[in-house]
């Protein structure tokens, strides 16, 4: 899977489209807050924060799930409140603990806090934004399918993320994607090079057989 890490999510999205694969990725409701690109296996959980309540599961269950996965891990937490974002799971303390476990990414449809601290950690953070408080935050489940910002995630899914968003990589097509991405990039760069050259003409552009790019 190492070849996938060399590509940005738009290139891999193009490759998935050429492979005829239905895609699942985050929409504009989730943005990268900190960190760089990542490629890792999903560990999932759900949380609530808006109203008081008992913990459904201890945070240690999430840590155990992270430790059970070989290789880089992406923690994906769905805020299941009717209106997400009342409080944050991820901040300095929980972030430091997950950083110590070596995760590569964190994705949530909720909000996070302690942004300056998060920027110093070794994993990327994608969230709906920032908030002030922890509020009544508690985890309600670990290890079940979740949906964050339009992206459906099952535990064990392979996720690729960068400044554009987070994309699920189907395992049956993962090995084919780098070659397809390279093929598409060569086609696109030929068009870009022509557009920047002295050979470019408006008439030639109108004759170019392109459906979309």
What are the language-model segments listed below?
Residues 1-155, 169-213:
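Feature captures the catalytic cores and cofactor-binding loops of soluble hydro-lyases/lyases
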Residues 159:
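C-terminal binding/interaction regions
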Residues 162:
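Short amphipathic alpha-helical "interface-anchor" segments enriched in bulky aromatics
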Residues 165-167:
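Channel- or pocket-lining gating/hinge segments that regulate access to a cavity or pore
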């Amino acid at each position: 899977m190492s070849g996938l890490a060399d590509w940005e999510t738009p290139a891999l999205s193009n490759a998935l489209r050429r492979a005829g694969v239905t895609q699942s990725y985050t929409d504009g409701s989730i943005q990268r807050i900190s960190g760089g690109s990542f490629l890792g296996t999903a560990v999932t959980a759900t949380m609530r924060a808006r109203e008081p309540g008992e913990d459904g599961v201890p945070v240690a269950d999430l840590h155990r799930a992270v430790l059970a996965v070989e290789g880089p891990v992406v923690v994906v937490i769905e805020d299941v409140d009717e209106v997400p974002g009342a409080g944050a799971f991820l901040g300095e303390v929980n972030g430091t603990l997950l950083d110590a476990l070596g995760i590569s990414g964190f994705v949530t449809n909720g909000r996070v806090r302690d942004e300056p601290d998060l920027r110093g950690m070794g994993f990327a953070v994608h969230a709906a934004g920032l908030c002030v408080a922890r509020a009544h935050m508690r985890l309600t489940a670990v290890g079940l399918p979740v949906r964050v910002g339009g992206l459906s995630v099952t535990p064990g899914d392979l996720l690729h993320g960068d400044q554009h968003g987070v994309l699920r990589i189907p395992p049956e097509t993962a090995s084919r994607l780098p070659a397809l991405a390279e093929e598409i990039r060569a086609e696109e760069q030929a068009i870009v090079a022509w557009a920047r050259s002295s050979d470019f003409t408006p008439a030639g552009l109108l004759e170019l057989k392109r459906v979309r790019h």
